[in-house]
């Protein structure tokens, strides 16, 4: 037996499917090693759904071959479009009974048939005979199409995660507003106590907005979400000094950052990388990838 065993090197490849492109980021032993993007034909991804599984699978296969990316430990994101989440108060139950109880609550609370969703949940807090549970429903067709595309590329995903949850993990703040703005998609996450208090994702595909127009839409949706949260939730409200952390390709522009900062009455910041990385990494653009790399599986 060797007394000096080499330390195990963990290589993880994260993959984000946007409407416009694929974004990859690879880590080795917890450090960012390489990253990049590959443009997608228009219409191949629409409303978060891969419309041609075979074509997408071939593109992913070519990307992984061309960039020499590892296929053994791949963590992929799923769009937040059409996903539904609820925070509910339930009786405190043993684990053996929780699954059925969550399904019953989801059937009552979710606006979509739960047969069309993959459900997951996490207990947020327990007090006395009650517990607060975060329930998430993601459309089955979104996940199924992505799994099939990865299989075409000879990849069995090690894990998958919803894009808004990956962004919350990447930003790593107890209280924050996370704004993600891409060419065809807008996402806003209100984070309280490190947990998703309110999450919304909007498609911009059919709106033909300029970048300032997209930011105006972001500001409008943000104001409505904060007002809704503060009026309807228990606990401390989201204050005027809670910062907005901007992510996504649109905010790679200094002009876009300044436009938002001038339009909202709260601090606007860029996130820093939660893991060691080269200085030249555009953290905001690859924030979802960074959050995927932090996922514990």
Model regions and ranges:
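Hydrophobic/aromatic-enriched cytosolic interaction surfaces used to assemble or bind macromolecules
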Residues: 1-297
């Amino acid at each position: 037996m060797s007394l000096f065993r080499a330390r195990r090197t963990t290589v993880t490849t994260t993959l984000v499917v946007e409407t416009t492109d694929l974004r990859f980021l690879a880590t080795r032993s917890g450090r960012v090693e390489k990253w990049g993007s590959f443009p997608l034909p228009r219409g191949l991804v629409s409303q978060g759904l891969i419309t041609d599984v075979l074509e997408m699978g071939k593109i992913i296969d070519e990307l992984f071959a061309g960039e020499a990316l590892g296929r053994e430990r791949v963590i992929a994101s799923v769009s937040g479009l059409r996903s539904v989440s609820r925070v509910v108060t339930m009786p405190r139950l043993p684990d053996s009974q929780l699954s059925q109880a969550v399904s019953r609550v989801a059937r009552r609370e979710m606006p979509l048939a739960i047969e069309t969703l993959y459900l997951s949940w996490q207990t947020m807090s327990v007090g006395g005979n009650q517990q607060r549970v975060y329930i998430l429903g993601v459309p089955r067709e979104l996940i199924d199409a992505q799994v099939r595309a990865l299989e075409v590329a000879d990849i069995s995903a090690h894990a998958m995660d919803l894009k808004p949850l990956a962004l919350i993990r990447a930003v790593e703040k107890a209280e924050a507003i996370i704004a993600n703005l891409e060419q065809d998609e807008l996402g806003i996450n209100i984070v309280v106590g490190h947990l998703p208090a309110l999450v919304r994702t909007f498609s911009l595909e059919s709106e033909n907005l300029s970048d300032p127009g997209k930011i105006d839409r972001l500001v409008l949706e943000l104001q409505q979400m904060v007002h809704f949260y503060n009026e309807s939730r228990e606990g401390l409200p989201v204050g005027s000094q809670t910062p907005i952390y901007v992510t996504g390709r649109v905010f790679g522009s200094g002009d876009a950052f300044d436009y938002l900062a001038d339009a909202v009455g709260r601090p606007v910041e860029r996130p820093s990388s939660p893991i060691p990385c080269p200085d030249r990494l555009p953290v905001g653009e690859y924030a979802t990838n960074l959050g995927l790399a932090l996922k514990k599986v």
